[in-house]
Amino acid sequence: MSDRAEVRNIPFKLGMYLTVGGVVNSNATRFSINVGESTDSIAMHMDHRFSYGADQNVLVLNSLVHNVGWQQEERSKKFPFTKGDHFQTTITFDTHTFYIQLSNGETVEFPNRNKDAAFNLIYLAGDARLTFVRLE
């Protein structure tokens, strides 16, 4: 996943809503939305896998701990994404959980494993083009 768009020094805090929109490449195999403090400290990594290894049309969620590595993956079959189409994902969180609303209105939850109350880096990587980021 070499293509990347990022927003640094963004004040994403408890009670706020982060909406990320973009367009999935027509030949996509995967793309990810990441929320954290740095590229080696990611609290929420949501990897959209269209066809990657043995994974077909699945969301893989994880977190990356600095100097430790990736943690236990969680998977969801909620996958309203289509190659070549627009997507919009809205994320909010508390000290226990990330609440991720997908384009079709379905929600996926993922633990806020470090109990963080604020993040300053959002980035999209892989086979999609970022069109907007909105923080409310």
UniProtKB/Swiss-Prot annotation:
One MF annotation (Gene Ontology) recorded for this entry: galactoside binding
Binding site for a beta-D-galactoside: 70-76
Alphabetized SMART domains for the sequence: Gal-bind_lectin, GLECT
Alphabetically ordered keywords of this record: Acetylation, Lectin
Subunit description: Homodimer.
PANTHER family: GALECTIN (PTHR11346), GALECTIN-1 (PTHR11346:SF97)
Protein name, UniProt field: Congerin-2
The species this protein was found in: Conger myriaster
